[in-house]
Amino acid sequence: MAVVRVIHEALARGESPATLGLLHPDIEYVNPPGAVEPGTRRGIAAYEDALRSMDEAFDDVRIEVREIIDAVDQVVVLATYTARGRGSGAQRQHEDGYVWTIRDGKAVSFEWFHKQADALEAAGLRASG
């Protein structure tokens, strides 16, 4: 859980967790449908490209971590995501969930969910329905 906490602290400062050596070189990054760039990408460069795309699309992005949950092989982060559309000025806010998989002190997988219940379910913490 400590690695995930440090990752989110770095992101809050506008710093890439890659610069801290916290990402596995082959990290898998999964964006949900409806995201700026949905789909799966692999590698640190692709992870950073996805973050850059988000920064290009939105101003004043904030991810406020509400809870970090140890789920044995994974770590779930429940957070409030707020941002303003760079072109439209439209404000967005939603309760997101993130599932991190950590091995040997590095993030090997990050999956973003627009619904916290979906993140919990993906980590085996809550049954569907």
What are these regions (language model features)?
Residues 1-26, 126:
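Short acidic-aromatic low-complexity motifs
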Residues 56-57, 83-93:
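Short, cysteine-centered beta-strand-loop-beta hairpins and adjacent loop/turn segments enriched
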Residues 63-69, 82-83, 95-101, 111:
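Hydrophobic/aromatic beta-strand elements that line small-molecule binding cavities or substrate pockets
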Residues 72-81:
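A short hydrophobic beta-strand element
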Residues 97-121:
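Short beta-strand edge/turn micro-motifs at domain boundaries
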